[in-house]
Regions:
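Conserved proline-anchored active-site loop of SAM-dependent methyltransferases
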Residues: 23-26, 34-48, 52-60, 115-122, ...
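Conserved Class I SAM-dependent methyltransferase catalytic core
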Residues: 213-262
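Mobile active-site "lid"/loop adjacent to the S-adenosyl-L-methionine
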Residues: 130, 134-141, 190-212
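Class I S-adenosyl-L-methionine
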Residues: 250-296
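Short loop/turn elements that flank and shape the SAM/SAH-binding pocket of Class I
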Residues: 171-175
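Class I SAM-dependent methyltransferase Rossmann-like catalytic core
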Residues: 1-29
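Class I S-adenosyl-L-methionine-dependent methyltransferase module
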Residues: 49-161, 286
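A structural motif corresponding to the C-terminal end of an alpha-helix
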Residues: 149-164, 216-230
Length: 296
């Protein structure tokens, strides 16, 4: 019986829900241990079956939401959300209530309050300043803890109870949890795209060529140990090519799988908007697909 896809209750930047069926066709079967190295909003973790899940992300504020979910029953979480929404008068038109609630969260940093804030923020998006204060504006007529988000929370809850979370820089993750035949998925910031976390000005480590090379070195070492990996990335974006990525794939003989996805809704104003973006999944193992080939 096919497993039902579940959407995370967080609309995390770069989430893979819309393409999860595409990338999962290239995942190994019968996964024992899975590591999601840049777990973000958890869409990949909660939709991938494994005997044991590890989920890591440097953004501890978001990870703490899921950790807080693990501490409480589902009824307790939903009751807290409903009571808090009523107490503050949160709605999709009450900007004053939103701003007051945001100020309160930035003082207390209670994870469930952050979850509620995200529900009422512009496009349900997540953003912090360099002091780790939530600074997304109000989502007028667009923000609400609605039926869909409630359903996503309910469906996600049962899939995270046994996940082991961590908030380390990816270089410091304990890869000893992985043995030959285990699986790692990596969806890092994309070096040549518009991700807001590439600039390193929001309180978390930025992403540049050094981080890119560090990740490839780690994946190479894991591959040499017999660990399977899948890496999401873009090889081409608005006239730029990620030569570091392509050279590494070519040198190692890894496999490229094309993914159909549109990044035109990037938050940044970009030139050359008519130039293509090529979303790819790289694996260190072959998969049967017409869209699969090796540069080696």
């Amino acid at each position: 019986m096919e497993r039902t896809l579940v959407k995370s209750p967080l609309n995390y930047s770069g989430n893979k829900f819309r393409i999860i069926d595409q990338i999962q066709q290239y995942f190994p079967d019968n996964i024992n241990v899975m590591v999601d190295l840049f777990c973000g909003g958890m869409d990949v973790t909660i939709n991938t079956e494994a005997e044991k899940h590890y989920a890591n992300d440097i953004n501890y504020l978001v990870v703490d939401i899921f950790r807080e979910f693990q501490k409480h029953s589902l009824d307790e979480i939903l009751d807290y959300v409903d009571r808090t929404v009523a107490e503050y008068g949160l709605s999709d038109t009450n900007q004053e209530a939103y701003n007051k609630f945001r100020d309160n969260y930035n003082k207390t940093k209670y994870p469930l309050d952050l979850f509620i804030l995200i529900c009422y923020s512009f496009n349900h998006q997540v953003r912090f300043n360099s002091a780790h204060e939530f600074n997304m504006p109000f989502g007028y007529r667009k923000g609400l803890f609605n039926f869909n988000i409630r359903a996503n929370l309910i469906n996600t809850y049962g899939r995270i109870k046994d996940v082991e979370f961590s908030t380390k820089p990816f270089q410091e993750f304990d890869f000893s949890v992985l043995s030959a035949g285990d699986f790692l998925y990596a969806d890092p910031p994309y070096l040549i795209s518009c991700a807001t976390y590439n600039d390193g000005k929001r309180g978390f480590t930025g992403w540049g060529e050094q981080e890119e090379r560090d990740l490839y070195n780690i994946l190479t070492e894991l591959s040499d140990r017999g660990v399977n990996f899948a890496l999401s990335n873009v090889s081409e974006h608005k006239g730029q090519k990620n030569d570091i990525l392509l050279d590494w794939v070519s040198d190692r003989g890894y496999f490229i799988h094309d993914i159909d996805f549109d990044y035109d809704n990037c938050n940044y104003h970009a030139l050359n908007t008519n130039l293509p973006t090529r979303e790819i999944l790289i694996t260190n193992y072959p998969a049967k697909s017409l869209k699969t080939y090796s540069l080696w």
